[in-house]
Amino acid sequence: MAENRGERRAAVENRYDAWDHEQAMKAAVRKFISYDQFSAQLRNWREARLNIIEHATSVLSQVSNLGRTHFYSRTERFGGSSLVGDKLYVCLNETRMKTALNNIIVALQTVNGEGRARRLGPREASANTGGEDSALNVAHQLAEVDDLLTDESFLREAVFTQDKYELVNGLRWAGA
């Protein structure tokens, strides 16, 4: 009825209050992935352990491109606006996770022989690379990441619900 009388309510813009340069930088740099999606992907990689050598290039690309930055912004809510339940998100920039993922990348690059000639010299680089050792190293690195995903301190520090992330970072969502 209020609209019939010519009165209009000001629409509340969906955005974070108190958004500043620091928040924008965090959003640009931090990479996040759904906990469920990450767990499923990790399980697939671990199950493919015997074929990891054959698929090293593909897995290397997947690990290198894991998660995304700009997961939230001034006008895009962390985790999205239509959340159902307490969906969990993993921050891939947490020190232990970042180190573990970098170790997987190095192990996969070693499978492909990348950097071998530079490290060992041309003569040693042409020798057999030891596929079983490489596969074992990759499997070990994947197990390290799997262990992190159930580590209590990691879960407290680097796994977030929308509410927890906003609380920890002083973000308050305004709007519907």
From Swiss-Prot:
A cellular component annotation (GO) from this entry: helical viral capsid
Subcellular location: Virion
Alphabetized InterPro entries for the sequence: TMV-like_coat, TMV-like_coat_sf
Ribonucleoprotein is among the record's keywords: no
Keyword annotations from UniProtKB, A to Z: Capsid protein, Helical capsid protein, Virion
Coiled-coil residues: none
GO molecular-function terms, A-Z: structural molecule activity
Predominant location category: virion
UniProt entry tagged with the keyword Transferase: no
One Pfam match: TMV_coat
General function of this protein: Capsid protein self-assembles to form rod-shaped virions about 21 nm in diameter with a central canal enclosing the viral genomic RNA.
Family indicated by similarity: Belongs to the virgaviridae capsid protein family.
This protein's name: Capsid protein
Chain's gene name: CP
